[in-house]
Design a protein with these regions (language model features):
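Glycine-rich phosphate-binding loops of nucleotide-dependent enzymes
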Residues: 2-292
């Protein structure tokens, strides 16, 4: 079980390049020709009203969905449409709904995230060969480093289900970092958090950026995202309507209209948005069923 790591790309290097990504569910289009790049050491935000296609776009990036059109590249290589291969390539993510192993310890949850970086085979593990033992110790040391980094080291032996909500969110991030990603995707990392927990999450994300890891964040907390991100892209009914620095995005009339519920020219109606949300939910439940 030898371990491998992925070195961070040099600052400013494009790590994610999504080009013309479109995702259809039957006759409904949830994502429409979206282009987006993320550079190493950069935090990019993705915002939009409910039904905008944000999580569907994330699922296209991580191999949960195969885009109907377009392509997704990581460090210049087109990604295979398989989540475990995407993780192995260097992309990790968290989810809207916490997906921890509730009855495993905090440390064990992080060790699960190391599986794509261990290379020893079945026989080495069964026979407890020296190479396996060495790699296992290296993984434990790395997992403890991540728990120190996220402020959870003192609770390494606690069951994940016994952590406060904000710390469960931190644990999800620690587990994602265990795969040594070059790009971290965070799907609503502050959902359900109080202001103190939100501030702690912000500080943690900045600290991750300092390690040279690129970060793409979906979030409904507009103040949080505008304070956090170098760039912000806005999706409305699957289309990217604007992208730029926070101050540019905040002043854009189309963004204001989308969040205030005022229709602008060419904007799909509420009925279409509701249909897209329903299609996304159905596809998500189907995907979860296939994974079990």
């Amino acid at each position: 079980m030898t371990t491998t790591t992925t070195a961070p790309a040099p600052a400013g290097t494009t790590v994610l390049d999504a080009s013309g990504v479109t995702m259809r569910f039957g006759g409904l289009t949830a994502v429409r020709g979206v282009d987006l790049t993320v550079n190493s050491g950069e935090i990019v935000g993705l915002i939009g009203p409910n039904g905008a296609g944000k999580t569907t776009f994330f699922n296209c990036l991580t191999g949960l969905y195969v885009p109907t059109e377009g392509k997704v590249s990581f460090k210049g290589t087109v990604l295979p449409p398989k989540p475990h291969l995407v993780t192995q390539a260097g992309i990790a993510r968290t989810f809207q709904n916490i997906r921890l192993f509730a009855n495993m310890t905090v440390l064990e949850n992080v060790l699960v995230g190391r599986h794509t970086r261990t290379k020893e085979g079945l026989w080495s593990a069964l026979l407890r060969l020296p190479g396996f033992k060495k790699a296992e110790q290296e993984s434990r040391e790395r997992a403890m480093e991540l728990l120190e980094f996220t402020g959870l080291a003192a609770k390494a032996d606690h069951l994940a289900r016994n952590l406060p909500y904000g710390e469960q969110r931190k644990l999800e991030i620690a587990r994602a970092l265990a795969s040594e990603p070059g790009l971290l995707l965070l799907d609503e990392p502050t959902a359900g958090m109080n202001p103190q927990e939100t501030r702690a999450a912000e500080e943690l994300i900045f600290a991750i950026r300092e390690k040279g890891i690129a970060i793409l964040v979906i979030e409904h907390d507009i103040r949080f995202i505008m304070n956090l991100c170098d760039r912000v892209a806005v999706l409305v009914q699957g289309e990217k309507i604007v992208e730029g620095p926070a101050e540019v995005v905040q002043a854009d009339e189309r963004v204001i209209a989308a969040y205030l519920g005022t229709p602008f020219e060419g904007a799909p109606g509420k009925e279409e948005a509701a249909e897209v949300e329903a299609a996304e939910a159905e596809a998500h439940s189907t995907t979860e069923g296939d994974d079990k």
